[in-house]
UniProtKB/Swiss-Prot annotation:
GO terms for cellular component: ribonucleoprotein complex; ribosome. This is Large ribosomal subunit protein uL4. One of its GO terms (biological process) is translation. Disulfide bonds: none annotated. One of the primary rRNA binding proteins, this protein initially binds near the 5'-end of the 23S rRNA. It is important during the early stages of 50S assembly. It makes multiple contacts with different domains of the 23S rRNA in the assembled 50S subunit and ribosome. Forms part of the polypeptide exit tunnel. It comes from Nitrosomonas europaea (strain ATCC 19718 / CIP 103999 / KCTC 2705 / NBRC 14298). The gene is rplD.
């Protein structure tokens, strides 16, 4: 078992026990790289598109006769060599960016990230994170009480007060356990989990 420091709003700190298979793994840089790369690739919409000569709007009439003008021969105004013409070999939304990653590897990668965050003192637990009213200043004051900046908070449930109070803060992200992702875990300076989510994270990743 490993121990995660749990901070109370009054400043008191105690250690809570957590599974070593989730929060005590050896760091595997190659696995984390593969998990992050796969997540970013699968998030791509794949909708970029460029217009070829058959897609652009323009006349398909031959611009001048083939011979006798002294100018280079030409055809339609949609010719890629002309200004306003189509693009040679245009990108089409037929590319498949999906990168398959086994569930076992993904979970192992997430466990590795949590373990490394804990080793670097970037992962802490708090007793709870409840907001009494949907006010941003109330949420900001609560963060100051815990001395937290640029933080991602993982909670078991986001009520309407917490959602409304936190959505306008640029350096705060509040997510439920089922919606955590590797990129967000690595993007913030601190990751905070509520006390009741420790077991839920273990159940999801084991």
């Amino acid at each position: 078992m490993v121990k995660i420091p749990c901070i109370y709003e009054n400043g008191q700190i105690e250690d809570i026990e957590a599974s070593e298979s989730v929060f005590g793994r050896v760091y595997n840089e190659a696995l984390v790289h593969q998990v992050v790369k796969s997540y970013l690739a699968n998030a791509r919409a794949g909708t970029r598109a460029q217009k070829g000569r058959s897609d652009v709007t323009g006349s398909t009439r031959k611009q001048w006769r083939q011979k006798g003008t002294g100018r280079a021969r030409t055809g339609a105004a949609t010719n890629p060599l002309w200004r306003g013409g189509g693009k040679i070999f245009p990108n089409k939304p037929t590319e498949n960016f999906k990168q398959k990653l086994n569930r076992k590897m993904y979970r192992a990668g997430m466990c590795t990230i949590f373990s490394e965050l804990l080793r670097n003192n970037k992962l802490v637990a708090i007793d709870e994170f409840q907001i009494e009213m949907p006010k941003t200043k109330v949420c900001l004051q609560k963060l100051k009480n815990y001395q937290l900046e640029n933080v991602m908070i993982i909670t078991s449930e986001i009520d309407s007060n917490l959602y409304l109070a936190s959505r306008n803060l640029p350096n705060l992200k509040v997510v439920e356990v089922d919606l955590i992702d590797p990129v967000s875990l690595l993007a913030y300076d601190n990751v905070v989990i509520t006390r009741d989510t420790v077991n839920k994270i273990e159940n999801v990743l084991q």
